A protein has these predicted regions:
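N-terminal small-domain helix-loop-helix segment of the aminotransferase-like
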Residues: 1-54, 61
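Conserved core segment of the aminotransferase class I/II
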Residues: 6, 178-234
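Short acidic capping loops at alpha-helix termini that bridge into adjacent secondary structure
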Residues: 43-49, 69-72, 120, 182-185
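Conserved PLP-anchoring active-site segment centered on the Schiff-base-forming lysine
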Residues: 65-87
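A short helix->loop->beta-strand "cap" motif at the edges of active sites that frequently abuts
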Residues: 71, 92, 151-155, 181-183
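Hydrophobic residues in well-ordered beta-strands that form the structural core
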Residues: 75, 96, 125, 156-158, ...
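Active-site phosphate-binding strand-loop segment of PLP-dependent enzymes
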Residues: 99-168
């Protein structure tokens, strides 16, 4: 979009070409917090928000943060193929629990998720709205899964980047609307889909406050932060 390109040009001409804060520009994190409030009517502290670069970078960081060699992760599939690779680089193993194709569209059976969890399961990746199936997780299912993962201390990595790609309603249900700040939940989102910024590689993640500093430290090992002028465009 023209407005976004213009903001990036202004930032470049203003000299925003140097390293930025690892967790992202203060102004952008505040704007993301405001955006989340505007669509979900919830308050997220800026300190819980990290802007590591692309949404895929955020997913990779979430996997690095929650998984190690002896662990297992569960992927709700069909899924984008990069997800299993993000898990594999941690040394963890993974398995998939599939959505089922029914006459009413794709569906996920939460009991199938429970049965697929192992003793060493540390993370569940779930993309809703889903690419490629278009399935959208219901609020009831979110409650069920969050309660289950809370009791087992399994981290939900919720990829909500398609939150505005939905028919009939303005925005898809988010785990953020029902979660406690301390819940084992990492929500990933970004600008690519909702704001037509696929090539800008700008996404964010919302984590429990208890791991936000560690997430920022881990981000330093990848790309330090998203380029400052791109953050200004966001």
């Amino acid at each position: 979009p023209t407005l976004i390109r213009d903001e990036a040009k202004i930032a470049l001409d203003s000299g925003e070409t140097f390293y930025g804060h690892t967790r992202g520009k203060v102004e952008l994190r505040a704007a993301i917090s405001d955006y989340v409030h505007s669509i979900y009517n919830i308050d997220i502290e800026d300190e819980r928000i990290t802007v590591p670069g692309s949404s895929m970078s955020a997913i990779t960081l979430a996997c690095q943060m929650t998984l190690s060699k002896s662990d297992h992760a569960l992927i709700v599939s069909p899924h984008w193929p990069n997800i299993d690779r993000a898990i594999q680089v941690t040394g963890a193993e993974y398995s998939c629990v599939r959505q089922l194709q029914t006459k009413n569209g794709w569906q996920l059976v939460i009991e199938d998720v429970r049965k697929s969890v192992r003793k060493n399961t540390k993370a569940i990746y779930i993309n809703s709205p889903s690419n490629p199936t278009g399935w959208v997780m219901s609020r009831e299912q979110q409650h069920e899964l969050l309660e289950f993962c809370r009791s087992r201390q399994i981290t939900i990595i919720a990829d909500e980047v398609y939150h505005r790609t939905i028919y009939g309603i303005n925005v898809a249900p988010s785990f953020l609307e029902i979660a406690l700040e301390t819940d084992p939940l990492i929500v990933v989102n970004g600008f690519s889909k909702a704001f037509a910024m696929t090539g800008w590689r700008l996404g964010w993640m919302i984590t429990p406050a208890s791991i936000s500093e560690q997430m920022a430290t881990l981000s330093e090992c990848y790309n330090t932060s998203a380029p400052a002028f791109i953050q200004s465009a966001g």
